[in-house]
Amino acid sequence: MSQEKYIMAIDQGTTSSRAIIFNQKGEKVSSSQKEFPQIFPHAGWVEHNANQIWNSVQSVIAGAFIESSIKPSQIEAIGITNQRETTVVWDKKTGVPIYNAIVWQSRQTAPIAEQLKQDGHTKMIHEKTGLVIDAYFSATKIRWILDHVPGAQERAEKGELLFGTIDTWLVWKLTDGAVHVTDYSNAARTMLYNIKDLTWDDEILELLNIPKDMLPEVKSNSEIYGKTAAFHFYGGEVPISGMAGDQQAALFGQLAFDPGMVKNTYGTGSFIIMNTGDEMQLSSNNLLTTIGYGINGKVHYALEGSIFIAGSAIQWLRDGLKMIETSPESEQFALASTSDDEVYVVPAFTGLGAPYWDSNARGSVFGLTRGTSKEDFVKATLQSIAYQVRDVIDTMQVDSGIDIQQLRVDGGAAMNNMLMQFQADILGIDIARAKNLETTALGAAFLAGLAVGYWEDMDALKELNATGQLFKASMNESRKEKLYKGWKRAVKATQVFTQDDDAE
C-alpha cells in the first residue's frame, strides 16, 4: 500500500521560522515553530544572523516530522515563503555570510535612500520597479554591506559573493549550494528588478554599483527549482517547487486569482494587496506596485498598501495601557461600549503609512469627554484599524479604476468579530474571513503542489480554502460617511501637531 503524500511549507518570518505539513485537502497535519534572536547593533538597526535562521529552519523541519511521524519520503514537494526584503550576502565558495542579514525594518541604510532621492532618481526607480525609494527595500542594504565590509566590493566584482533575500538563502542551503534563484515576488521587492521587462535593471545596478553576478536567477512562483540535498532533509531528496514573499503567498493562499480581488492580513501591521491582473498599474497615491505572482508563463501584478499599526494597537492596550489582559478580550470590551463612536484614536506611533506616508505624525486621541469609558477607548482603538484599511482601499479603487466588491481577510486580528463587522460597515462591502487562517503557508504549499501535480490546477484549489465566515455591511450610508469624515478630520489634526519646538 502506498504511503500518503504531503506538501511541506517553510514559513520563514521576522521573529520565528515555521514548518507546516499540509494534506491534499489543504488541512494542516503537523507544524513546528522556533524563534531566533533579533540583533539591534544601534538605534533603528535590525539584523539577523543568517546561520541562526538556517538552523531554526532545520530545527522546525525536524519538529514537523517528529510531531506527525511523517517521513521525508512522504513529502511530495516543499514551498517556501519568507519575510521580504531582508538581505544576505555570502561567500560563494564557503557559504559563510560576510555580514548579518539586514532586516526589512532596519533603517541603517536610510542615508543611501535619501541620497538617491536628492540625486533625482525617484521617478525613474518608481517607473521601473513600482516602488518608492526607501531603506525598506534590498537595494540600499546590498550597497551598505558592500560599503562597510572591507574588500566586499572587490570580491563582488570578482564573482566571489552572492546576494539573496531569505528565500534565495534557504534554497541555496537546502540544495547545498547547487541552486541560486529567487522568484518574481521577492525580486520585485529588491528595488533592482524591472517589473515591466521582468529583468534585473542595468541602469539601477550601475547607479548603485552592484555587480550583476551577485544576483540570483529569477524564476516563476511555481516550478521545480532543485531538490534538497539528502543530508539537509533527513535523507530525502525532495523538489523545492514553490516560492513567494509572505504577503504575496497570503494573496495566493486566499485564492485571490482574479483582477480586483483584495486580501488584508491583520498582523502587527496590516498588508493590503490587490490583484490587478496582467497590467502593471503605477500608483499616483503612494501605493506600491509589485508582482503578486507569476505562474504558467503569466505574471499577475498587484497594488500594495502597508499600515504600520494594526494588531500592535491591541497589544498597546494590553501591555502599555493595561486596559485589557488578553488581546481577544478587546472584543468584549468594545461590545460593552455605549459610545456613539465619537472617540477617535489615531495610532500613529511610528508615523502614518499608506496613503499618508507621514513619518513625523504621532499618536493622538480625539473626542474624549468626562463620560468616556475604558470600553469606549478600546472600541475606538479597534475602529482605528478599520478606518486605516478604508484609507488604503479607497486609494486602491482610485488608482486601479476597479470597484472592489469584497475584502478577503486573515491574520490574528481577523478573529475579532466586532472588528470584522465594523470593517464591513465602514467599507460598505463584504468581508470574507478564510476558514483556514494559515493563508501564508498555505499559499506556499499551493504553489509547490501545483508544480509537481499534487493539485491538478488552480481550479482544484478553489475547493480547499472556502470562506469561513462572511460579514455583510449593515450600516446606513449617511452614518458610515459621517464616521469616516470624523476619522479624516482626526488624521488631519494629528498631522498638524508637532513635538518640534522650532515649528512655532
Swiss-Prot record:
NCBIfam families, per database record: glycerol_kin, PRK00047.1
Keyword GTP-binding: no
Entry annotated with the keyword Cell cycle: no
Post-translational modification: The phosphoenolpyruvate-dependent sugar phosphotransferase system (PTS), including enzyme I, and histidine-containing protein (HPr) are required for the phosphorylation, which leads to the activation of the enzyme.
Function as written in the Swiss-Prot or TrEMBL entry: Key enzyme in the regulation of glycerol uptake and metabolism. Catalyzes the phosphorylation of glycerol to yield sn-glycerol 3-phosphate.
Documented activity regulation: Activated by phosphorylation and inhibited by fructose 1,6-bisphosphate (FBP).
UniProt binding sites for ADP: 14, 18, 268, 311, 412, 416
UniProt protein name: Glycerol kinase
Record-linked PANTHER family: GLYCEROL KINASE, SUGAR KINASE
Pathway assigned to this chain's UniProt record: Polyol metabolism; glycerol degradation via glycerol kinase pathway; sn-glycerol 3-phosphate from glycerol: step 1/1
GO molecular function: ATP binding; glycerol kinase activity
Residues annotated as binding glycerol: 84-85, 136, 246-247
Enzyme Commission designation: 2.7.1.30
Binding-site residues for ATP, renumbered to this chain: 14-16, 268, 311, 315, 412
Organism (species): Streptococcus pyogenes serotype M6 (strain ATCC BAA-946 / MGAS10394)
Enzymatic reactions: glycerol + ATP = sn-glycerol 3-phosphate + ADP + H(+)
